Every structure is written in structure tokens, then in C-alpha cells.
């Protein structure tokens, strides 16, 4: 992946410098729109505010990590539903259909390869830009 000079500058600024999640979360209000805060070895760390239901989707080529920073959320799989609370995480295996949702606003971090689209191959109205830095 080729970074433009602005993206490269942002990525370099995050290296060896603390990143404050609370400060980053204060920079946006929209739900289901991941914001990149750092990169490491072609992986991106993304903060997302979620509320309500997302679409069922999968990511054919990569696993996806959900880490709950604040609040709680659930993820529905084909055969079960799991709940994640603040301080918990799960790795969703590549290709596995899942639908995240949260009754109340929940703040999470996603860790996934750069370029991963939030809706996988499903597309739709909730598809967000895949490289939106804050």
C-alpha cells in the first residue's frame, strides 16, 4: 500500500509517541465509521463508536480483532452470540460471518490489515472509508 505524504506524516507521528484513546474518541461522533489512529507492519489500529446494529458480513482474506475500550457489545455469529465488555477482546476468524451490535454506545478498537473495508464484501450504506485518520 502506498501512503500519500499526509498519511505517511500521520503514521510517523504515532511511532514512539503515546496515543490517548479518550482524546481520539473526542474527535468524532459518528457511529460505525472506523478512524485510524496508528499503523504497524501493514496493520491499522482503528477506533470506532458503535450503537445499534451493523450488517452481517465477513472478511474473506483476514482475521479481525475487536477490543472493547468502553461499554459493551455483542457479536452474532451463525451458531452463537458472544458479549464483550470493557477490557475484553475477540479475534473473528477470516471468512466467518458476524454481525456486531450494541444497545448503547460502545467504544472499540479494531486491529486489521490496512485497506480492510468495514462491511467486508457485503457493501451497503454502512460502508465507511477504509483509511480515515484522526
Give the predicted meaning of each segment.
Residues 8-46, 123-134:
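A short, N-terminal "cap"/entry segment at the start of jelly-roll beta-barrel domains
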Residues 41, 69-70, 85-86, 104:
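A cytosolic small-molecule/anion-sensing beta-strand core signal
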Residues 44-60:
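Conserved short histidine dyad/triad with adjacent acidic residue
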Residues 52, 61-73, 78-79:
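Glycine- and acidic-residue-biased ligand/ion/polar-headgroup-sensing regions
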Residues 79-94:
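Short acidic-glycine-tyrosine-enriched beta hairpin
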Residues 94-123:
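Ligand-binding loop in jelly-roll beta-barrel domains
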Amino acid at each position: 500500500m502506498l501512503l500519500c505524504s499526509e498519511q505517511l506524516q500521520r503514521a510517523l507521528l504515532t511511532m514512539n509517541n503515546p496515543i490517548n484513546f479518550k482524546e481520539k474518541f473526542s474527535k468524532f461522533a459518528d457511529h460505525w465509521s472506523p478512524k485510524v489512529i496508528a499503523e504497524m507492519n501493514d496493520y491499522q489500529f482503528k477506533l470506532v463508536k458503535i450503537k445499534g446494529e451493523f450488517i452481517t458480513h465477513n472478511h474473506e482474506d483476514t482475521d479481525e480483532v475487536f477490543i472493547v475500550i468502553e461499554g459493551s457489545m455483542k457479536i452474532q455469529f451463525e451458531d452463537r452470540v458472544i458479549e464483550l465488555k470493557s477490557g475484553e477482546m475477540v479475534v473473528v476468524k477470516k471468512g466467518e460471518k458476524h454481525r456486531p451490535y450494541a444497545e448503547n454506545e460502545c467504544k472499540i478498537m479494531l486491529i486489521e490489515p490496512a485497506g480492510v473495508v468495514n462491511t467486508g464484501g457485503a457493501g451497503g450504506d454502512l460502508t465507511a472509508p477504509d483509511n480515515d485518520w484522526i
